[in-house]
């Protein structure tokens, strides 16, 4: 399929951006017309975030609701493979090493984007990610799809069964639903380097109805961890304050950070 798609864009140079464990490939296409991105993945992927037809539906839905996202150029599938081609969104990822005097503005922009997304009309969102997502977690443990060597610090060294037991123990009784990105990490938020205004959201394949904590937990964790030392715990706290600290339940935050270990 990749060779066929390359023939559709013969004047572009293809640059491999990412090769995922689930068999998905991401390419950046340059050199002719607007810069494009092409995703190629199994038609029925192990990772739900690489269900490309679903991601295309989400991109179209977000665009209709005023959210800046990549424009879908082409989507399709054959018996075994799916593909999605989109226009690149201008801007720099919020995860980049911003100058110290700009970092607060970057974090504030992520919080503003989260609020904007969470204020979209729930009744109009056809994508659902309620607590039954724990069923997907169990499936991933059974099928050996959870990378137990890449767990965060607190559950490091746990078995899949231990993770599931903790998930059951800490599962919230109810959810207040909003429209969630599903993977609201700084690298999926793009900003204008000059104004620090949001230019777009990318990698929206996990966008669904869920509690706001599903997004807040991942964004705060990524801002706090040492892998991006130009941010850190103080900026994670700033993000939550800017979003609205009165909305934040630390137990739910911990649950959704744990849930992410399964995906």
UniProtKB/Swiss-Prot annotation:
EC number: 2.7.1.95
Pfam families hit by this protein: APH (PF01636)
Active-site positions on this chain: 183 (proton acceptor)
Keyword Nucleotide-binding: yes
GO biological process: response to antibiotic
CDD domains on file: APH
Similarity comment text for this entry: Belongs to the aminoglycoside phosphotransferase family.
Protein's UniProt name: Aminoglycoside 3'-phosphotransferase
